[in-house]
Amino acid sequence: MNWRNSSRKKILMTPKITALPPGKIEIQNQRIGGLPLSAQYNTRVVEVKPVFDGQSWDVYVEDAKIISHHQFDAVMVCTGRYSTPMVPPILGIERYKGHVMHSHNYRTAHCFTGEAVLVLGAGPSGIDIALEIATVAERVYLCHDQPKPLTKDFPPVICQENGILRIDGDHTVVLKNGKIVSATWIVLCTGYNLTYGFLSEGCRVTTDENVVFPLYKHIFHADFPSLAFIGLPMRVIPFIIMDYQNRFFLSALEGSVKLPSCEAMKQQAAKDLAKHVSSGLAKRHFHCLPKMKMWNYLEDIANICGLPKVPQYVKDLYDITSKERECKCQYKDIKIRILPDGTVRYSY
């Protein structure tokens, strides 16, 4: 699999990448100076425990079945949010005789050749997978619960439908609008659960409805500020978000930025979550920071840490890509030019 990234090179913050937009191989081939010497590979973190109420951390790791103990002043959890598939309960799934796959395990489309495929979920992964499968499948049902059909210029082989109500037979799927379709494959593009099995109970981290709590600014554990979570925000430019979060955390560790008291951070975390829920948004979307929320978040961190603001051309690139993604399946083929004055021009 070598999916092309949906982000432009200029907002990936990786200057050596030349492909626009880069694929999986180009991204994997990036090497940051010094990382191979300092990183320990093929090692699994077994447990992380706070010592002296978070003043230091006991970390147990497993390498070649040998568990060793290390102690650190701080811990950054950078495990991402795409490792534990969320598999929704589907009534009658035990009667289904076709194949079921989660997007986490998707690699190539060749096994779907000539098949009728139901893709459940129309987020970025669901759409990308449906488009790739559509090049070889007989029919693709893109099923979702969004209030309106997506306005993309999908190829004729892709048919938008409601979500799944139940499975009625070997390959018979009943949709929520009562329509019946036959599918030999079901591909679940239903997201992921946030799990941190390596964090001990003493870390006092909860993940109810995929909200990591209690975190200050989506980064700092309010009780243990030397424990940070990097990369939780969704619907963002991930590399820029993670860069600013890293700088914020390191500034706090170095002492150039002073954090509020633990109690104040905990109160702020609870207040932010309550505000999110009271506004009518789903609790599970607390870490979503679309567009203006993202820019405000980055500006807040920049002001606190004295960092440069996000350049305007990056915001323009994000807006252009988002707009084209909404209506065009080939948005990744867009050609971008940034003029000397910072103006962004694009064409296909």
Predicted regions and their residues:
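Short glycine-rich His-centered loop
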Residues: 14-23
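Post-kinase regulatory C-tail/linker adjacent to protein kinase catalytic domains
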Residues: 263-273
